[in-house]
Amino acid sequence: MQQPYEYRYPQGTGPSAPPPPPKAGVIVDPKYCSLHPVDLAIVRKVLKITDGNFVITNAEGNLLFKVKDPFFSLHEKRILMDGFGTKVLTLKGKIMTMHDRWLVFRGGSTEEVDLLYTVKRSNMVQITTKLDVFLADNIEQKKCDYRLEGVWLETSCFVYAGDSDIILAQMREKKTMQSVLFGKDNFCLTVNPNVDYAFIASLIVILVEIQISLRKLTKQLLLE
């Protein structure tokens, strides 16, 4: 009688097994991780009147985050605040770098000790926007920890874990007559379970800011 195979290691493990796919988990705060999918609505006020040009709500319409754009700043800087006005993240952009690099810090800090992750375009020349995300402890930045990829015409994008095909979140742009008339960009964002939605929301804000800077640069080049 043929004996069943015996495995020295459980299947899928051992010295020659491929590394497991990376997981998202907590990046900003455990309270921003849910056991269930989270649907968010992101509205960018193109013709902004107040200092909050992004508003992020949940499916029930409750305010979760808003983005403050300081008027007097030497750098591209955005502050992600919760519904109570507490600073959650500070997004500091280096737009003039070749890959449009953004540094994201905890709270209202811009100190190196509070750096959580870095976001930059994967290539200088792109047909669609692709962003690489490196956590603060990824010093060499040879492989990204997360990545964001837009699709044709940038009407939607996906956030992936590392170089894998594991989707952590999906964003799509929602065009309405009201949004066009009142100068607003509307985005629908679905964040998968156990994924930090404050982290994902910050990536979408950075994506939009990079797209805006690229459009301005393209317009300037065409006028020259």
UniProtKB/Swiss-Prot annotation:
What this chain does, per the record?
A: Might be related to the phospholipid scramblase and tubby-like superfamily of membrane tethered transcription factors.
PANTHER family, sorted: PROTEIN LURP-ONE-RELATED 1-RELATED, PTHR31087
Which lineage do the record's taxonomy fields give for this organism?
Eukaryota, Viridiplantae, Streptophyta, Embryophyta, Tracheophyta
**Name of protein:** Protein LURP-one-related 1
Q: What species does this protein belong to?
A: Arabidopsis thaliana
User: What's the family?
Assistant: Belongs to the LOR family.
Q: Where is this region: Disordered?
A: 1-23
User: Which domain of life does the protein's organism represent?
Assistant: Eukaryota
